[in-house]
Amino acid sequence: MSQTESAAFLAGYPLKAHNTFGFDVRARFACRIEQEAQLMPAVRDPRAAGLPRLVLGGGSNVVLTGDFGGLVLLVALRGRRVVREDNDAWYVEAAGGEPWHEFVGWTLSQGMAGLENLALIPGTVGAAPIQNIGAYGLEMCERFASLRAVELTTGAVVELDAQACRFGYRDSFFKREGRDRFVITSVTFRLPKVWQPRAGYADLARELAANGHAGTPPTAQAIFDAVVAVRRAKLPDPLELGNAGSFFKNPVIGPAQFEALKLREPDVVSYVQADGRVKLAAGWLIDRCGWKGRAMGAAAVHERQALVLVNRGGASGAEVLALAKAIQRDVRERFGVELEPEPVCL
């Protein structure tokens, strides 16, 4: 493909294969973006004038409640490389369309540790900063160096550091002020040469112990393998049962509210944060409200993990959203706690 070849405009494009819930919806127009230079010609095409835009990578963090009446940009940018190194770290760049899990595995194959706790998280590299993905004691922002993005209004190419991205818990600038304004075309990570394992989570520690790592520091590959095993045991494969992983964020509340809650619910699962606030396990709250395994139509709560909502076949995004709202209502009424969805609902 030449540098100047435009991405094809695809009308009435089916999005079922482009969202991990498997919702059978369509886009008015879609363009598959394989080169950064294709972005602005697609956005500025007269057929897209005045239409809303949606950027999709793996579609693992979106609930499509109906057909999208605008232009969907399907990010298919690929490539990964070590851009530089110093005495302390490697700096590794990956294109926005690289599958996240494959990228994590590749870094380990190249002898670079640091992302192994984030194995098997669905989606693409370009989506990772938007959500500030995290799991098993590590957040992406801890390994983040910078990203490259195209601003869709002006066509400007920008380089943003962590401060500009304003990372928070499953949050960033791109979920708020920057939403739908940018396409992240590549991300650079800083992977430390002096690496320390993070294996404190109980499920992870048990899996490592079962694999012969009890009392001995695990390798990065051992952590990667253990994370994959734990996630596969707890979470359904989107190719077999449509889902977007954890549907709700773990809520964080103040110490006074937590003490009052603990009086009513002594066994509440909680984690004290550095600032004194307390993070609650959303899955535990949902399970206590009796939702694990329950369904509303073809939308259901997974029987093994209450934090995961699933499409059992033929569910619409609206049905999943209705289920989510019913869960939020019950958790609010019983615990006085608000659950916030992780995926973007459109």
Curated annotation (Swiss-Prot):
Pathway membership: Cell wall biogenesis; peptidoglycan biosynthesis
PROSITE patterns: FAD_PCMH
Domain FAD-binding PCMH-type: 22-194
Annotated function: Cell wall formation.
Active site: 170, 246 (proton donor), 342
Record flagged with keyword Cell wall biogenesis/degradation: yes
Protein origin, superkingdom: Bacteria
Cofactors: FAD
Name this polypeptide is given: UDP-N-acetylenolpyruvoylglucosamine reductase
Broadest EC class assigned to this enzyme: oxidoreductase
Keyword annotations: Cell cycle, Cell division, Cell shape, Cell wall biogenesis/degradation, Cytoplasm, FAD, Flavoprotein, NADP, Oxidoreductase, Peptidoglycan synthesis
Biological-process GO terms, alphabetical: cell division; cell wall organization; peptidoglycan biosynthetic process; regulation of cell shape
MF terms (GO), sorted A to Z: FAD binding; UDP-N-acetylmuramate dehydrogenase activity
SUPFAM superfamilies: FAD-binding/transporter-associated domain-like (SSF56176), Uridine diphospho-N-Acetylenolpyruvylglucosamine reductase, MurB, C-terminal domain (SSF56194)
Keyword Cytoplasm: yes
Catalytic activity: UDP-N-acetyl-alpha-D-muramate + NADP(+) = UDP-N-acetyl-3-O-(1-carboxyvinyl)-alpha-D-glucosamine + NADPH + H(+)
CC annotations in GO: cytosol
